[in-house]
């Protein structure tokens, strides 16, 4: 399938790389995306809409960035993602970019959970969570070294 993107131009994407979000992300109608990982943008990857060339979200793989971060899914979320007890998931965090790396944050309240076997994803809204919506990505605020990450998918 050929898709037009405003950032990367015309791309040829295999049909099996299309991710479906049965429940669109809050505020967006698009439900079909693909994961792009241009090496020059590492550690970031892009969740690119296949239907809207201008809609893409910058993300990082949570387990590479914050290994202790965990998301508990409800039985309804398991069902919506077509998961069972043997299924693997990949949890992505949406990134808010900034000119100064110290100001780059990730949204821990709204992770995107992907079932890579079925290519189904869902943004999980962790209401009342102890997690912030703007957590420093590189831990500079806590004096940690810069974290090197990569997107899996």
From Swiss-Prot:
PANTHER family: FLAGELLAR ASSEMBLY FACTOR FLIW. It comes from Geobacter metallireducens (strain ATCC 53774 / DSM 7210 / GS-15). Keywords: Bacterial flagellum biogenesis, Chaperone, Cytoplasm, Translation regulation. It is found in: Cytoplasm. One of its GO terms (cellular component) is cytoplasm. Acts as an anti-CsrA protein, binds CsrA and prevents it from repressing translation of its target genes, one of which is flagellin. Binds to flagellin and participates in the assembly of the flagellum. HAMAP family: FliW. This is Flagellar assembly factor FliW. Pfam families: FliW. Its main location: cytoplasm. Interacts with translational regulator CsrA and flagellin(s).
């Amino acid at each position: 399938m050929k898709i037009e993107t405003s950032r990367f131009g015309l791309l040829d994407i295999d049909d099996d790389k299309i991710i479906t979000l049965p429940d669109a992300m809050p505020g967006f109608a698009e439900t079909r995306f693909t994961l792009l990982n241009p090496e020059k943008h590492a550690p970031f990857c892009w969740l690119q809409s296949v239907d809207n060339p201008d809609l893409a979200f910058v993300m990082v793989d949570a387990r590479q960035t914050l290994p202790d971060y965990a998301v508990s899914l409800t039985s309804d979320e398991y069902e919506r993602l077509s998961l069972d007890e043997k299924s693997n998931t990949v949890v992505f965090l949406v990134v808010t970019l900034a000119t100064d790396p110290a100001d780059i944050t990730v949204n821990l309240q709204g992770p995107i959970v992907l079932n890579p076997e079925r290519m189904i994803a869902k943004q999980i809204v962790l209401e009342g969570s102890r997690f912030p919506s703007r957590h420093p990505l590189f831990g500079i605020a806590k004096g940690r070294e810069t974290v090197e990450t990569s997107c899996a998918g």
